[in-house]
Amino acid sequence: MSIKSEEISALIKQQLESYQTELSVAETGTVTYVGDGIARAHGLDNALQGELLEFSNGVYGMVQNLESNDVGIVVLGDFDGIREGDTVKRTGRIMEVPVGDAMIGRVVNPLGQPVDGLGEIKTTNTRPIEHKAPGIMQRQSVSEPLQTGIKAIDALVPIGRGQRELIIGDRKTGKTSVAIDAILNQKDQDMICVYVAIGQKDSTVRAQVETLKKLGAMDYTIVVTAGPAEPAPLLYLAPYAGAAMGEEFMMNGKHVLIVYDDLSKQATAYRELSLILRRPPGREAYPGDVFYLHSRLLERAAKLSDELGGGSMTALPIIETQAGDISAYIPTNVISITDGQIFLDSDSFYSGVRPAIDAGASVSRVGGDAQIKAMKSVAGTLRLDLASYRELESFSQFGSDLDAATQAKLNRGQRIVEVLKQPVHSPLKVEEQVMILYALTNGYLDKVAVDDIARYQSELFEFIHASHQDLFDTILATKKLPEADKMNGALDAFAEQFQPTAAK
C-alpha cells in the first residue's frame, strides 16, 4: 500500500486550519497558612473583599482580610485537604446560593446544598448572600398584621409584616417554640417561612423539622442549618444565606417570615474567625464591626413599596442571654437594631406560665399600627391590667387585708395570666383570640374558677363555631368587633350552659 504525499499534506493542512489556540488565564496565589477554618495566601494582589476563591482540591473560600502581602480567607468546607504551598485561584464571583420555589420543603446547609437526603435541588436561580438592604424610598410603613397565633404576642406585642421583632431570653425558656409556633400559624396565609438554625444540635434541628412536617408546615418552609460541628465560617454565613433565599420571594411580591435561631452563636462564630484572622478585639473580645454584622442582616427585612410589588420579609431574630442580662453587648446591639423585643422570663417559665412572655419588658415599636381593630379594642387595657396585677401581687403576699377594689384587680390579673397561657404547637386563629379576650376584658371570666379557664376557652370556641359562627365570620371579614349586643348575647348563652368543675 503506497502512501500518497498529497493526502498527507492535505491532512496536515486540515489539522492546521482547525487548530485553535485557547489560553486559560487565571490569577493564582500560594497558600502560606491553613488551620481553624481559615487560610492565608500570597500573590492574589487583585482579590476583592467577599470574592470566592477556589483551592486546588475543589474547596471554595471567601476573601475576608486584604493585607499588603497576603489575603485572609475563610474556608467554606473541610480545610483538612488544603496544604501549605497549594495553589488557590480567583473566580471573579461572589458567594451565591440557589433560590426559588424548588427550595421550599428542603433542609439545606449555608451553601444551599441539600442535607435531607431527598436528592439534588433542581433550580438554576441563584442570589448573592450579601445584598444591599432596600433604601428609604423602596420601603413603606408596616401596615399588615403577622398573626403568630400566640395570644400573649398578638394582643400585647403585635408583629406586622416587614417588622424585625427580637425574641430574647435565657436558654430553655421557650424561644424556639415561640418562633416555630409563629411558622405553624402561617398555614393558609400565603407566607413563605425560612428557619435558619445556627449552631443548633443536629438532633434538635431534626426534631423541629419533624414537627414542621407532621403539622404540614414544611409545605411552605425552607430550613437552613449549620450545626455546631460545622466550621465557624458556615455558622457565620448561615443567616445571610437564609436572608438571600427569603429575599427572592420578597422581591417577587410575596410575604416571607424568617427566623434566625440564634444570632448569639453567629456572633460567637464571627468573633472566633476575627480573632484567628488577627483582627483587633474590642468589648468582650468581639471585633469592632460586630454591630454591622447584625445590622446589615436585619435591615434586609422590609415591607417593600407597591411599585416594587409590595412584598415583605419579617425577621424574628433570637438572642440567648446569660442570667437574664439584656444589657450585655450583643443583646443591646440587636435590641437597638430591631423594632421591638419579646422578652422570655425564666422565673415565669419555671412557675408554669408558658409562653413565659414578660409583658413589662416586651415591646413592639411598629406592630401596633398593623393590629386589626377588633384586637386593638379588646387588648387595649390588657397590658395595664397585667402590670398593675404584677405590682399588687408582690404586696398581697404579705397577707394583709385587701379592699374590694384591690382584690378585684388581683382576681382579674390571675385570669389574664391564665388566659394568656397556651400549649406549645397549638396556635389560635385571630377570631378565636378576639373572642376569649373580649370575654376576659368584659368580666365574663371573673366568676369562672382559674382552674376552669382552659376548659372554658375550648368549650367556648366549640359553642361559637356551632351556634354563632357569624361572629367569627364578621371578625374575619371586617377586622372589627361585631355589635356588642351580639357578642354579649352569645357569651351570656354560653355562660348559662357552662358548668364549673365542682358542679359536674
Curated annotation (Swiss-Prot):
Main location: membrane
Site (Required for activity): 362
UniProt cross-references to CDD domains, sorted A to Z: ATP-synt_F1_alpha_C (cd18113), ATP-synt_F1_alpha_N (cd18116), F1-ATPase_alpha_CD (cd01132)
Pfam families tied to this protein: ATP-synt_ab, ATP-synt_ab_C, ATP-synt_ab_N
EC id: 7.1.2.2
Positions bound to ATP: 169-176
One GO cellular component, as annotated: proton-transporting ATP synthase complex
Topology with respect to the bilayer: Peripheral membrane protein
Subcellular location(s) of the protein: Cell membrane
Top class in the EC scheme: translocase
Keywords: ATP synthesis, ATP-binding, Cell membrane, CF(1), Hydrogen ion transport, Ion transport, Membrane, Nucleotide-binding, Translocase, Transport
Keyword Electron transport: no
GO terms of molecular function: ADP binding; ATP binding; proton-transporting ATP synthase activity, rotational mechanism
Reactions performed catalytically: ATP + H2O + 4 H(+)(in) = ADP + phosphate + 5 H(+)(out)
Record's keyword annotation contains ATP-binding: yes
Function: Produces ATP from ADP in the presence of a proton gradient across the membrane. The alpha chain is a regulatory subunit.
Subunit annotation: F-type ATPases have 2 components, CF(1) - the catalytic core - and CF(0) - the membrane proton channel. CF(1) has five subunits: alpha(3), beta(3), gamma(1), delta(1), epsilon(1). CF(0) has three main subunits: a(1), b(2) and c(9-12). The alpha and beta chains form an alternating ring which encloses part of the gamma chain. CF(1) is attached to CF(0) by a central stalk formed by the gamma and epsilon chains, while a peripheral stalk is formed by the delta and b chains.
Family per similarity comment: Belongs to the ATPase alpha/beta chains family.
Protein name: ATP synthase subunit alpha
